[in-house]
């Protein structure tokens, strides 16, 4: 996944220089992501100030619908993503990183667990 340089640069600048990035970059809404080994899944992102939380609308054998899949800070792009064994056993959060390619494309990388790219679902 290759970021679009101009979009990435302007979005990063807006996030870094805004007092509240929520007025500059709003990621709220439904996003579609392909979780490797599963299928396309829909997540709903809510945003409060500089914090975003993604909750699964459609789930899988590991993290079901209604559960948080990741949360992150727009200021640092650091966050944590939820992982679990099949049937949602032993769920836990691991460190992760949010990446913003454009207003319509983001990704989240779970430490040692892979990356999911999301596209805005209009």
Where are these regions (language model features)?
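Soluble ligand-binding/transfer domains with enclosed cavities or grooves
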Residues: 1-122
């Amino acid at each position: 996944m290759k970021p679009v340089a101009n979009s990435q640069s302007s979005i990063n600048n807006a996030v870094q220089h805004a007092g509240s990035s929520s007025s500059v970059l709003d990621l709220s809404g439904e996003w579609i992501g392909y979780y490797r080994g599963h299928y396309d899944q829909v997540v709903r992102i809510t945003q409060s100030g500089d914090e975003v939380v993604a909750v699964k609308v459609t789930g899988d054998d590991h993290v079901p619908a209604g559960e948080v899949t990741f949360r992150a800070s727009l200021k640092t792009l650091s966050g944590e993503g939820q992982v679990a064994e099949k049937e949602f056993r032993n769920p836990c959060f691991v460190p992760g990183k949010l990446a913003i390619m454009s207003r319509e494309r983001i990704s989240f990388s779970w430490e040692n667990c892979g990356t999911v790219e999301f596209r805005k679902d209009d």
